[in-house]
Amino acid sequence: MKFTFVTLFDNLVKGYFQDSILKRAIDKELLSIDYLDPREFSDSKHKKVDDTAVGGGAGMVMNPQPLYDALDSLKKEDEDVHIIFLTPVAKPFRQNDAKRLAKRSHIAFVSGRYEGIDERVIEKYADEVFSIGDYILTGGELASLVICDSVSRNIEGVLGNSDSLSVESFETPLLEAPSFSKPKLYDDTSVPSEYLKGNHSKIRSLKLALSECKTKFFRPEQLLKHTTRKSYEK
């Protein structure tokens, strides 16, 4: 899988791939990372990439010319590239999107800055547009990394243990059950006794009950999906 980050600030992105799981995936050639700076495509004397908003409004907007030329260059290099824009004015990114996108060969993330990107760029080049939540960031780079990370861990070989994927939150309607480590007793608090007895059937039952409790508290709408699924399966 190749990821291309179309960004004015590639240093914000590069550091994320210097350690841990994604670094190992790059070393194993499961992932490759590239960067494209719209400034390099600006036809203005001072490599300007933004301008005031037409129709009024605060702040500057990324203007179309540098992005048109940058994305044309990207598509000329690889016509199968899947271009994703990040903006809070979009559908929310979900786990199912991560699994689906993991089957792609090349994804490009276009990160906005200032007050956003000229809408004509999005209309012309976007294969998909995502939001990662109902809040505002100073730029799209963090949102791009969130999606890149989520997609990457669904690519075969990136995670050391493929079983990790099947038991995570959002693989089913329920949130994942709580996890515990050693020591068994710490700060006068013990790991649940059923976890210690080795009865895997009872452990599974307890984990299911804990998952349902956690889901009811944090994400009650997910619990409704779980209840509906169980009724349908009957």
How does the language model describe each region?
Residues L142, N154-S193:
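Internal, active-site/partner-interface "lid" segment
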Residues N63-R113, E119:
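S-adenosyl-L-methionine/SAH cofactor-binding core of RNA-modifying enzymes
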Residues K2-E40:
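Glycine-rich, flexible N-terminal cofactor/catalytic loop recognition
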Residues T4-V6, D34-L36, H82-I84, I107-A108, ...:
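Hydrophobic/aromatic beta-strand patches that form the interior of the parallel beta-sheet core
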Residues V49-A70:
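Short, structured active-site "lid" loops
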Residues V121-D163, E168:
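Structured adenosyl-cofactor binding patch, chiefly the S-adenosyl-L-methionine
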Residues P183-K234:
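SAM-dependent methyltransferases
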